[in-house]
Amino acid sequence: MPQTPPFSAMFDSSGYNRNLYQSAEDSCGGLYYHDNNLLSGSLEALIQHLVPNVDYYPDRTYIFTFLLSSRLFMHPYELMAKVCHLCVEHQRLSDPDSDKNQMRKIAPKILQLLTEWTETFPYDFRDERMMRNLKDLAHRIASGEEQTYRKNVQQMMQCLIRKLAALSQYEEVLAKISSTSTDRLTVLKTKPQSIQRDIITVCNDPYTLAQQLTHIELERLNYIGPEEFVQAFVQKDPLDNDKSCYSERKKTRNLEAYVEWFNRLSYLVATEICMPVKKKHRARMIEYFIDVARECFNIGNFNSLMAIISGMNMSPVSRLKKTWAKVKTAKFDILEHQMDPSSNFYNYRTALRGAAQRSLTAHSSREKIVIPFFSLLIKDIYFLNEGCANRLPNGHVNFEKFWELAKQVSEFMTWKQVECPFERDRKILQYLLTVPVFSEDALYLASYESEGPENHIEKDRWKSLRSSLLGRV
């Protein structure tokens, strides 16, 4: 079965250099290079550049970049149809009398292209039209005399089906978790005193909690497809008069679920701090989360770290001055400094580069962990997308932009494939994922109940919240 190399080896500081690989420029035309780097091309020429022939196979960096960015201009099923057509027509796979020797040369290359597509962008094949075209082309390859092709085609299809089945199962679990926490949220809003447990009774060790948070982060990262970063920003293609790509719906559900997890963790932290009646218990909870956040930093789990800091900086928590007076904040100040947004998160980006470098030379799974602050990664990709046009004035696809986009996404692809080395604790994971959390209003109410309002505005809000949430005046 054809194997693909790791993502970390795909991109260097420049784009795809045609001197390193055989180029199809002469045969398809319409591609523009500068200093041997592909900068732009017509969409049709770029599609032809994707399709292998007897003497040519596209560089894997080009395959990833084009499959990632092409969805800004056309649906994946439309691209697959064109690829199939080119494979069949150009390589005469539809002709039973075609040269068998040529077939032996081209079949493994087409199979390799299909394998790379199904391995890297498996979610494209949830579309029946994609799967139909894939099966048709795979059948043409497998119907040859070489038994190896049949075996490899079968392995490719089985691997794809396993991935799609795992995705469906994951989505079912997410839906179940979401419904569980939502059902109980109503009870929590109206009767906050009914909640007995807190996070420390479930897990009194901050290091263990940081490890369990890392489990959740890596699992959710793993299910985000690279295409979701592009599909989140899909807009109407100016050369497409009829429709925008993905007009049916933006297929970004796993990316959105991950962002929702960040928000949930922030609210969970704030809830756990605001819930205790006694000041010393609230102070203890703050110090507990500071230790959890510090361990997240040490692990390389920057997303959980930022979610915890965000929760502790929410107004209902930060206003608890008497509680904070009992807290040793030196460690928290250091963590806040690391995640300081000034100078475009310079300190965080420096720490992220350090973690990424550690990951490259890692001797253990733990050292490989890099979980970026996800909202900032999305923001970086958004500004890259907004800052450069998809097409040049001559109608060419601006491929220089997409090299940079693919470089950012491919780094993420490397990080998301790391296996979590820590032992799973189902009880702790269940609590983190399903325990009810306060809404913003409920957080303010709990905060005012703990440390009374300090001015008339807070007093009026407190009365309003007591009336709306508790039915009291």
Curated annotation (Swiss-Prot):
The keyword Glycoprotein does not apply. The lineage of its organism: Eukaryota, Metazoa, Chordata, Craniata, Vertebrata. GO terms for molecular function: guanyl-nucleotide exchange factor activity. Guanine nucleotide exchange factor (GEF) with specificity for RAP2A, it doesn't seems to activate other Ras family proteins (in vitro). The keyword Metal-binding does not apply. InterPro entries: Ras-like_GEF, Ras-like_Gua-exchang_fac_N, Ras_G-nucl-exch_fac_CS, Ras_GEF_dom_sf, RASGEF_cat_dom, RASGEF_cat_dom_sf. Residues 204-452 form the Ras-GEF domain. It is found in: Early endosome; Late endosome; Midbody. SMART domains: RasGEF, RasGEFN. Residues 34-164 form the N-terminal Ras-GEF domain. Gene3D superfamilies: Ras guanine-nucleotide exchange factors catalytic domain (1.10.840.10), Son of sevenless (SoS) protein Chain: S domain 1 (1.20.870.10). Interacts with Ras family proteins. Interacts with CCDC124 during cytokinesis. GO terms for cellular component: early endosome; late endosome; midbody; plasma membrane. Transmembrane segments: none annotated. This is Ras-GEF domain-containing family member 1B. Its main location: other. One of its GO terms (biological process) is Ras protein signal transduction. Keywords: Endosome, Guanine-nucleotide releasing factor. Pfam families: RasGEF, RasGEF_N. Induction: Up-regulated in macrophages stimulated with IFNG, GPI-mucins or bacterial lipopolysaccharides (LPS). Coiled coil: none annotated.
